[in-house]
Design a protein with these regions (language model features):
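Active-site helix of classical SDR
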Residues: 34, 42
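Short C-terminal tail/terminal secondary-structure segment
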Residues: 23, 103, 114-133
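C-terminal helical subdomain
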Residues: 58, 78-109, 113, 120-122
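Residue(s) in the substrate-gating loop at a strand-loop-helix junction
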Residues: 18
Length: 133
């Protein structure tokens, strides 16, 4: 994709990361590492492509109300309560909120943004709370 964007004069790439690309949670180490790799890939690509007119950013969602979240992390009332405890906005994110962020980053309105990992997590990373080890 990047090669074609360079040939045509520019574009925008938006990678999907996660707040777990920044956190270290021993029970999901491989997921943490893979999302952390996406963050670094985003930054390296942004530096390598900036002068060619290609912007590269990533979106790092927190817990979003999806079927996957329902099956993987929202498995009980207790699990939901733990998620809310570490989310200052006290609600799950909606898929449309992630889509809107991606659309913004891909748009001309974000033409001076590259190399950023945009966290959309209801304030979780600001709280700086992770799960007990």
């Amino acid at each position: 994709v990047a090669r074609e964007m360079v040939k045509t004069g520019g574009g925008s790439i938006v990678n999907m990361s996660s707040v777990n690309g920044t956190l270290a949670i021993p029970t999901i180490a491989s997921y943490n590492v893979s999302k952390g790799g996406i963050n670094q890939l985003t930054r390296v690509m942004a530096l390598g492509l900036a002068d060619k007119g290609v912007r590269v950013n990533a979106v790092a969602p927190g817990t979003i109300a999806t079927e996957l979240a329902a099956k993987a992390v929202l498995t009980s009332d207790e699990a939901k309560a733990k998620i809310m405890m570490r989310t200052p906005m006290k609600r799950l994110g909606e898929p449309t909120e992630i889509a809107d962020t991606v659309a913004y980053l891909a748009s001309d309105a974000a033409s001076y943004i590259t190399g950023e990992i945009v966290v959309v997590d209801g304030g979780r990373m600001t709280l700086n709370y992770t799960v007990p080890v």
